[in-house]
């Protein structure tokens, strides 16, 4: 009998809503009785309104959730949470993009570092190649001379080989008609003749018993040198075989001459037995020829090739045997486990050998890396030293440029100094001397005319005194190096400095003007002495007379005027000379610095880069 609608709803309510187990569910008869009894309305109400605890919690939660969602604060909070989540997502995306950019920048930095390292390696290799090329060029230049010598020796040996291939024929030993002898025979004959002369010159003084050295010793040395030169020329120009044949020919010729002399003197014929060595003893001592040695070498090569072919055939046989044994082992190992064990053992042994090889290779690579690191450190240290040296060279070049500029300025000042002195002399001294010269000539003419009226008066001392051998001072100052002891003119200058009481190290630029002034004073005093002596002679030889006295007074007055004029001129000259002498020490210092240190532009009184010349020299 089928269940009614109420019964089905009650059964469904018990099963689904209350989750009653199948064993505890009521039977159909019980459900029918409950629905047909007075409690049917009650069960209908229960089915509609009674729910399980779980469903009640769900309903309550749903009600609370809907109330929670309807709250505007909750809506605002949810919107803010969504915004925060969105911002977090965007921030995460930005962080990811930044990480990607950082990775890309790191990759670019790594690539740039690798590129720079490759550039440095390339530059280093280029420098190494340049250094190696320079070394190769130097080695080539160093090998040019040995190569040239070897080429010359090779040409000489080729010429000697070509000459050795040519057979030299000598004529008969005894020939009545003169024949044209070969060049080698003439050279050997000349060498033997020089050797004979040398021995004769060497043995002749000993045979005479003389022990005192004489000019013959020089003759012996000369003959010895001639003989050595001829032998060297002979060995250089002719092969050894030709020389030996020429010597044998000369020996035979000399033997025939001795025989003829013995026969001519009526002596008995004596057999000149030559020590002929047996062929059996000499055959073993004869060196093999080059052809024989080459043949022996090729025979040895053929034997080795034959042995190689035999060894290759034996290797092929052993290889085939090994393959057969491997196939037999595979055939005998029918079990899969044993075969796997064998394969695993073989694989293990192969992997172990490969591991050992890789370990050895890793050790080699580690050692190579260590060596490369050491080499890199050395190269970095060398690079640092090269950079420091380059900086030092640049500083030195800058200093040299400054010194060259100062040097040119000093040269300009030095070139202007003598010109200024010469211009001063031309402006001051030359006009004064030209002005004094007519007056002196006029006075001399007056004295000569007056002397004609007094033939008995000796007026020679009154005439101007000319010193013989006195030469004007040179316009070019002597060098300061003339006081050096090795200079031929230094002895006279040093003696003059000792005589004048000046220090030994005094420069000749200061010594010569002082000596010239003292010499002029000496000449002036000698003139005065001669004048006084002449006056005394005139006074003692001639009778006193007014005319002579008046003449002498006139002469004295004129002489005084002349002396005054000359004194003024000499004072002016002395002032000019003093000024020139005051400038001489400065010129001396300039010239000394210029000649002793031509590459230095700094002078003693000048400062170059905060240093004086002695400080620069000390540095």
From Swiss-Prot:
Return the InterPro entries for the record: HAUS5, HAUS5_metazoa
Q: What does this protein do?
A: Contributes to mitotic spindle assembly, maintenance of centrosome integrity and completion of cytokinesis as part of the HAUS augmin-like complex.
What is the annotated localization of this protein? Cytoplasm, Cytoskeleton, Microtubule organizing center, Centrosome; Cytoplasm, Cytoskeleton, Spindle
**Which cystines does this chain contain?**
none
GO cellular component assignments: centrosome; cytoplasm; HAUS complex; mitotic spindle microtubule
**Homology family:** Belongs to the HAUS5 family.
Q: Which UniProt keywords apply?
A: Acetylation, Cell cycle, Cell division, Coiled coil, Cytoplasm, Cytoskeleton, Microtubule, Mitosis
Picking any one GO biological process from the record gives: centrosome cycle
**Organism in which the protein naturally occurs:** Mus musculus
Q: Which gene encodes it?
A: Haus5
Entry protein name: HAUS augmin-like complex subunit 5
Q: Which domain of life is it from?
A: Eukaryota
Q: How does it assemble?
A: Component of the HAUS augmin-like complex. The complex interacts with the gamma-tubulin ring complex and this interaction is required for spindle assembly. Interacts with EML3 (phosphorylated at 'Thr-882').
Name positions with the PTM N-acetylmethionine.
Answer: 1
Q: Which residues form a coiled coil?
A: 73-108, 310-395, 550-590
Main localization of the protein?
cytoplasm
């Amino acid at each position: 009998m089928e269940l009614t609608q109420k019964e089905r709803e009650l059964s469904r309510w018990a099963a689904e809503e209350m989750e009653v187990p199948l064993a505890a569910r009521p039977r159909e008869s019980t459900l029918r009785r409950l629905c047909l009894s007075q409690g049917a309305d009650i069960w209908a109400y229960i089915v509609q309104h009674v729910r399980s605890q779980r469903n009640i919690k769900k309903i309550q939660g749903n009600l609370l959730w809907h109330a929670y969602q309807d709250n505007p604060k909750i809506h605002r909070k949810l919107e803010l949470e969504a915004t925060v989540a969105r911002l977090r997502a965007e921030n995460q995306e930005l962080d990811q993009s930044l990480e990607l950019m950082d990775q890309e920048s790191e990759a670019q930095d790594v690539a740039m570092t690798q590129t720079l390292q490759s550039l440095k390696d390339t530059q280093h290799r280029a420098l190494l190649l340049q250094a190696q090329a320079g070394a190769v060029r130097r080695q080539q230049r160093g090998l040019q001379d040995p190569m040239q010598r070897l080429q010359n020796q090779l040409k000489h040996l080729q010429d000697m080989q070509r000459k050795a291939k040519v057979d030299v024929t000598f004529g008969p030993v005894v020939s009545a008609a003169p024949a044209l002898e070969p060049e080698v025979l003439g050279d050997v004959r000349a060498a033997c003749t020089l050797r004979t002369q040398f021995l004769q010159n060497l043995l002749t003084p000993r045979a005479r018993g003389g022990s005192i050295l004489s000019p013959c010793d020089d003759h012996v040395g000369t003959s010895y040198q001639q003989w050595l030169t001829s032998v060297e020329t002979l060995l250089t120009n002719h092969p050894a075989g030709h020389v030996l044949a020429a010597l044998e020919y000369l020996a035979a010729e000399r033997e025939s001459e001795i025989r003829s002399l013995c026969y001519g003197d009526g002596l008995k014929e004596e057999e000149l037995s030559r020590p002929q060595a047996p062929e059996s003893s000499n055959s073993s001592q004869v060196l093999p020829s080059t052809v024989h040695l080459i043949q022996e070498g090729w025979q040895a090569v053929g034997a080795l090739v034959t042995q190689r072919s035999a060894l290759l055939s034996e290797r092929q046989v052993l290889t085939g045997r090994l393959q057969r044994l491997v196939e037999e082992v595979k055939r005998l190992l029918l079990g899969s486990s044993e075969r796997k064990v064998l394969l695993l053992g073989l694989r293990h042994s192969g992997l172990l050998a490969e591991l050992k090889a890789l370990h050895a290779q890793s050790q080699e690579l580690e050692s190579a890396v260590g060596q490369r690191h050491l080499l890199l450190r050395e190269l970095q240290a060398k690079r640092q030293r090269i950079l420091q040296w380059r900086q030092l060279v640049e500083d030195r070049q800058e200093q040299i440029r400054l010194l060259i500029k100062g040097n040119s300025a000093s040269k300009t000042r030095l070139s202007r100094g003598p010109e200024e002195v010469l211009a001063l002399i031309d402006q001051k001294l030359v006009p004064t001397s030209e002005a004094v010269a007519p007056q002196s000539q006029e006075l001399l003419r007056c004295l000569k005319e007056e002397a004609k009226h007094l033939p008995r008066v000796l007026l020679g001392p009154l005439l101007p005194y000319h010193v013989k051998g006195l030469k004007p001072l040179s316009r070019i100052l002597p060098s300061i190096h003339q006081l050096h002891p090795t200079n031929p003119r230094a002895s006279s200058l040093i003696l003059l400095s000792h005589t004048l009481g000046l220090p030994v190290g005094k420069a000749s630029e200061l010594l010569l003007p002082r000596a010239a002034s003292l010499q002029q004073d000496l000449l002036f005093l000698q003139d005065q002495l001669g004048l006084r002596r002449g006056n005394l002679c005139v006074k003692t030889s001639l009778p006193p007379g007014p005319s002579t006295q008046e003449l002498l007074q006139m002469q004295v007055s004129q002489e005084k005027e002349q002396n005054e004029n000359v004194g003024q001129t000499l004072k002016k000259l002395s002032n000019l000379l003093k000024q020139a002498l005051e400038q001489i020490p400065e010129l001396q210092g300039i010239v000394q610095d210029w000649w002793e240190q031509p590459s230095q532009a700094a002078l003693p009184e000048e400062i170059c880069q905060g240093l004086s010349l002695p400080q620069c020299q000390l540095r």
